[in-house]
């Protein structure tokens, strides 16, 4: 049996990794624990990020990271899935979480990565028969960029929501957290223009 764990990370640039598992609301823990890693479908999973209007999520701005660990042999396998924008209106859940001065970015796993998700799922299924404990870690990383003219001295406050299937609604994965925008060289990450 798999144990689901939420090790949620927000990150900007290569530094500023913030373990945000402390920011996972208690009410979201049962939803995380109920996620069935064997039946996860890349075409179904959606992530939403609420960020200040002064920031954007570029094409490489958000990643879903799934890590499975097995006690037998102390083996770990990790898969990173880059997320792309999802067209359409926000769900009622997301609409209720809109705030003045913030935008909600809906994203999903790139459909071309569906075969990798299928391979990852097959790997997890093969572990079912293996003795010992197994665990699944779900992480979301974000790398927002600063829009031209925005204040580079104010770190963005970001919230992350997860939607495991299209039949379910989103739930809060990470409450609003401040994320440093400064890159290792000391500069802010600016959005590309034109």
Positions of PLM-derived features:
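Glycine-rich, aromatic-bearing surface loops/beta-hairpins
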Residues: 128-194
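C-terminal motif of bacterial Sec signal peptides marking the signal peptidase cleavage site
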Residues: 17-20
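Bacterial N-terminal signal peptides that target proteins for export
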Residues: 1-10
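Bacterial signal peptide processing site
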Residues: 22-25
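Beta-strand elements of well-folded, non-transmembrane domains
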Residues: 51-55, 68-72, 142-146
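Post-signal peptide N-terminal segment of mature Sec-exported envelope proteins
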Residues: 29-52
